[in-house]
Amino acid sequence: MKYSHIGIPTTSAFEGEIDLPELKMTVSDHENNPFGIQWQRYWEDAPYPHLVKTVPHVAFEVDDLNAALIGQNVIIRPNSPSDGLIVAFIEVGGAPVELMQYIDPEEKLS
């Protein structure tokens, strides 16, 4: 497991906004800073759990998403928000955690 980013929900505008209409959210690029901070503003009709839309989450890259989900409280089932990436969210101690698997692990994991 490798740290990827922290996603911080906000209702305010932020620098470098990227609209993602298919996901019903606006984000910043977490790769444009050394700490992986990603701002996230969810659109009114975004179909995500309240926990994900209101509480910051930490995201980790995993080699095997299905194995990482065993025994976890899955709150967003595995899905593919972009080409080459599968993600799921779990709840751990009241906080959302994003698990990410790149289809081609050499692309991101080192």
Predicted regions: what they are:
Residues 1-32, 36-48, 73-110:
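Vicinal oxygen chelate
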Residues 51-80:
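Mid-chain, well-packed structural core segment of small domains
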